[in-house]
């Protein structure tokens, strides 16, 4: 690998450094207090009985993780199986060394290996370096779709209609 950098699939022991990189990304994205995820939640969600994400890391000779690509399987009703790239981050000191490309290539290879028909991700509209990076790789950066979100408080306060509660119950063979 480049400059004694190793690209590998992430393991549970990487999570403290991964969470640190995620926090570094939040600072870069002007949202330093937005990360509420915890190490325990990442251990449960990535390495529990039903893992919901995977990741690749770049590790230097000092065993420091300098890059991360975290992704998960998603589904497009229009296209089918896809991978969603949640975070692609290289620590600031290692940027512009080709490491983002190594991580992105690994995710593309994973998408191909798992039969995904699409790889999707988000990029902030002001993050020109990232937009340029993705465009250089041949990606189309969409402008017509807006994202909707409900945060933890909104989810808790949302008034669920009785029919929706029934729909979320185990299947009984009846339809709504």
Where on the chain are the PLM-derived regions?
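Short, charged, solvent-exposed linker or helix-capping segments at domain edges/interfaces
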Residues: 157-163
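Conserved acetyl-CoA-binding loop-helix of GNAT-fold acetyltransferases
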Residues: 96-109, 136
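Conserved beta-strand-loop-alpha-helix junction that forms the acyl-donor binding cleft
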Residues: 121-130, 149-153
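Acetyl-CoA-dependent GNAT
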Residues: 5, 9-13, 20-81, 104-105, ...
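Conserved GNAT acetyl-CoA-binding A-motif
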Residues: 112-122
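Structural motif
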Residues: 114, 136-137
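A short, internal acetyl-CoA/4′-phosphopantetheine-binding micro-motif in the GNAT/acyltransferase core
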Residues: 88-95
